Amino acid sequence: MARVDNYEQRFGGIGRLYTPEGLARLRQAHVCVIGIGGVGSWVVEALARSGVGQITMIDMDDICVTNINRQLPALSGNIGKLKTEVMAERVKLINPECVVNIIDDFISPDNQAEYLNRGYDYVIDAIDNVKTKAAMIAYCKRNKIKIITIGGAGGQTDPSKIQITDLSKTIQDPLLAKVRSVLRKDFNFSQNPQRKFAVDAVFSSQPLIFPKMGEGCEVSATMNCANGFGAATMITATFGFFAVSRVIDKLLK
């Protein structure tokens, strides 16, 4: 009997779900993940466990102890290490043949042309800087690069409220609302609320839960180490899994 390829042994369950032809497509796919934090780290995990053949990660942040509540690589022994490097090691344990590229930088309007023009089959945006998100989405749209954006995952407790819609239609998400505003103001996206942006967005319809007074500094719209909304793994991970599910569906169509 012929020896079954190790890749097929590891990801045969994916092939039975998405067909052998679908698995072969995933094996050839190249997906870029921007932001390897509370959402992005779970995105990378799901891509790796789905047999995606090449993953590029863009981030230069290190792991801090306050990431432990929501980020996959955040363990006691990893504090201070780069998130991308820890996740790259993990991906190789899941799929040794996966090509993992690390871009040790934060994406910005100044470098996005260099970092985004690398032949990706899909870009997954998991950052929380409004102007950077907007500029990146606009760049991808102009250059016909497939992108899905992910909204704010902080301040929520109910994963059943997470969904995907066009970026023009999200609700209860201040981050994506600000991104919409910048896209319309600075990048000539349609002002007509009935017109879609043709960009998928992951968001939650749950009203935000704000920290009680005295539980930290001023509340920011992010989930950083010092202040901002509280966050839980079952929400941040689910945001990431929704994004990967949509990306796989699009890759296989």
Language-model features: where?
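N-terminal charged helix/coil linker that caps or initiates catalytic domains
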Residues: 1-32, 65
